[in-house]
């Protein structure tokens, strides 16, 4: 089995459980003086003058094609339900980050406005039911996996949006700038940030009983996919165990569906080697399918 990268064929090499432990332990908490920060902002896209009307997939496709020609400093991507996301470059200060993303948002809004569309900064769509815009194997597999716990996964994929803050892990040494302290502090701030950004009390045009219906959806998805490891004095070890013991969402297959045995963890995959042996690329992909409140990304 091989990967085709830039026209070159690269053999896939299986990874063992011990190799996975070493890789996750070594790459997910890169330490050093905390200097840079970034932000990822997701937006719902609605009709400018009639936001209760759904935007057709053809219109979304046309406006996203137009946006590809707009020079932006942030990376522009599209979420499964057609939500728009801007991911900033690493910035040396908060003001630099805000200025850059604000300028990009102005440019994006101008293009959308020409087509009668607008960005809406809500955590959950108050009117529309989930509807997939992107038809890709990754999202087919994600939908199948999340459907096992109920409808919340489809709402999360297609009708939710968020603000995600990216910061350096911190120094190896203990103290207020150490990564252990910053990891703990990020988790403590989670509830505060959820409350501060809570602006989505409706779904289907009815109150859900939550100020943040987006947070409700994550709670309904469950801790295996949307939870994090237990906080202790060894974040690297705790995160490594969490990654290995989390269910695999999908096994990529160039010639067919990405289905996976229900409940199979990555640890079990490294031991059973079925439906095929896992590779480093599979590990990297598995890391992108875990959605804890705080995720170490190797920054």
Residue ranges and their predicted role:
Residues 123-149, 156-157, 166-295:
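Loop-rich catalytic cores of soluble enzymes, especially ATP-dependent carboxylate-amine ligases
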Residues 299:
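Substrate-recognition/cap regions that form aromatic- and gly/pro-loop-enriched pockets
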Residues 1-153, 159, 184, 198:
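Terminal catalytic/cofactor-binding subdomain
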Residues 85, 164-166:
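Short aromatic/hydrophobic contact patches that present stacked aromatics
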């Amino acid at each position: 089995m091989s990967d085709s990268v830039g026209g070159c064929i690269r053999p896939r090499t299986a990874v063992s459980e011990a190799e996975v432990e070493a890789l996750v332990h070594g790459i997910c908490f890169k330490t050093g003086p905390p200097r840079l920060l970034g932000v990822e902002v997701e937006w719902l896209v609605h009709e400018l003058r009639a936001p209760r009307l759904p935007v057709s997939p053809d219109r979304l496709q046309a406006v996203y094609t137009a946006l590809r020609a707009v020079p932006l400093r942030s990376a522009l991507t599209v979420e499964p339900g057609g939500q728009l996301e801007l991911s900033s470059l690493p910035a040396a200060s908060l003001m630099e980050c805000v200025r850059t993303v604000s300028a990009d948002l102005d440019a994006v809004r101008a293009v959308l406005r020409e087509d009668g569309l607008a960005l809406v900064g809500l955590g959950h769509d108050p009117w529309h039911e989930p509807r997939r815009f992107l038809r890709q194997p990754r999202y087919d597999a994600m939908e199948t996996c999340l459907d096992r716990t109920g409808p919340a996964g489809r709402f999360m994929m297609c009708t939710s949006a968020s603000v995600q803050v990216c910061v350096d892990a911190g120094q190896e040494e203990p103290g207020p700038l150490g990564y252990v302290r910053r990891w703990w502090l990020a988790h403590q701030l989670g509830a505060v940030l959820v409350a501060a950004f809570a602006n989505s009390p409706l779904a289907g045009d009815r109150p859900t009983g939550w100020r943040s219906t987006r947070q409700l959806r994550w709670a309904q998805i469950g801790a295996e996919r949307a939870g994090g490891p237990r906080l202790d004095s060894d974040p690297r070890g705790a995160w490594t165990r969490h990654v290995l013991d989390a269910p695999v969402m999908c096994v990529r297959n160039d010639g067919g569906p990405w289905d996976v045995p229900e409940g199979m963890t990555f640890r079990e995959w490294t031991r059973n080697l079925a439906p095929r042996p896992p590779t480093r690329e599979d590990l990297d992909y598995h890391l992108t399918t875990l959605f804890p409140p705080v995720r170490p990304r190797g920054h």
